[in-house]
Amino acid sequence: MSTYLIGDVHGCYDELVALLQQVEFTPGQDTLWLTGDLVARGPGSLEVLRYVRSLGDSVRMVLGNHDLHLLAVFAGISRNKPKDRVTPLLEAPDADELINWLRRQPLLQVDEDKKLVMAHAGITPQWDLPTAQACARDVEAVLASDSYPLFLDAMYGDMPNNWSPELTGLARLRFISNAFTRMRYCFPNGQLDMYCKESPESAPAPLKPWFAIPGPVAQEYAIVFGHWASLEGKGTPENIYALDTGCCWGGTLTCLRWEDKAVFTQHSNRQADSDDDKAAIAS
């Protein structure tokens, strides 16, 4: 039995299938972990959701910012952008079932035996694990409730950007979703910066990647995340793994086998040749 962790799929269904064939993934015996952003940009978001849902207990995933945006589009809150290529999913006969399944997926995965946690963007250094788990449950409960459109309508925005246990209501939920799904850079005190899109080498002082600021979770657990394709899986501490390697932009889909830390890749079926693609990789 093996545990395979794969970075952001972004609708790259063919590459996902090829990568799972490469590692000889066996549902029912092996477990697949997915860092979120299953949908958008690649051509096969519908097929990805259908396949991942079919895996049942053999998959553990987290929601990413593009997954949350899809929920907002389906709810009529946000606009369907042609570049996201999700129209076939929105118009599918099983769209309701897929969306209802997706909005009941978690923001955080924890395996105590493996001392392993996974979140789409990472874990803010301002949180210990019990706080992260409680915060994840707050948003997950709203997403699974009938009032989820209210949260989806309020989730867009960059403030508040500093954690406080005294945060309440939609402001609290927005901070939590930003920390789990959009975070890249922080100030030295752990306060989020939602604006910088530079590479770590070019980021202005005093900003640092969230994983470069000591936090309590990383002291006890390995952390797996996606979201940040321009890292190309490099530059993180030894126990923190960046798995988004930009498959939908012409890069690769990356898989980490947890038991021996072997890394497998599947090249994208497309090339990043447009200015929009290059800008997206840089961000």
Swiss-Prot record:
Keyword Hydrolase: yes
A Pfam family the protein falls into: Metallophos
UniProt-listed Enzyme Commission number(s): 3.6.1.41
InterPro entries assigned to the protein according to its UniProt record, in alphabetical order: ApaH (IPR004617), Calcineurin-like_PHP_ApaH (IPR004843), Metallo-depent_PP-like (IPR029052)
Single GO MF descriptor: bis(5'-nucleosyl)-tetraphosphatase (symmetrical) activity
Enzyme class: hydrolase
Reactions that this protein is recorded to catalyse: P(1),P(4)-bis(5'-adenosyl) tetraphosphate + H2O = 2 ADP + 2 H(+)
Keyword list, A-Z: Hydrolase
Domain of life: Bacteria
Family, per entry: Belongs to the Ap4A hydrolase family.
Function: Hydrolyzes diadenosine 5',5'''-P1,P4-tetraphosphate to yield ADP.
Name of the protein in question: Bis(5'-nucleosyl)-tetraphosphatase, symmetrical
Organism whose genome encodes this protein: Cronobacter sakazakii (strain ATCC BAA-894) (Enterobacter sakazakii)
Taxonomic path: Bacteria, Pseudomonadati, Pseudomonadota, Gammaproteobacteria, Enterobacterales
Encoding gene (name): apaH
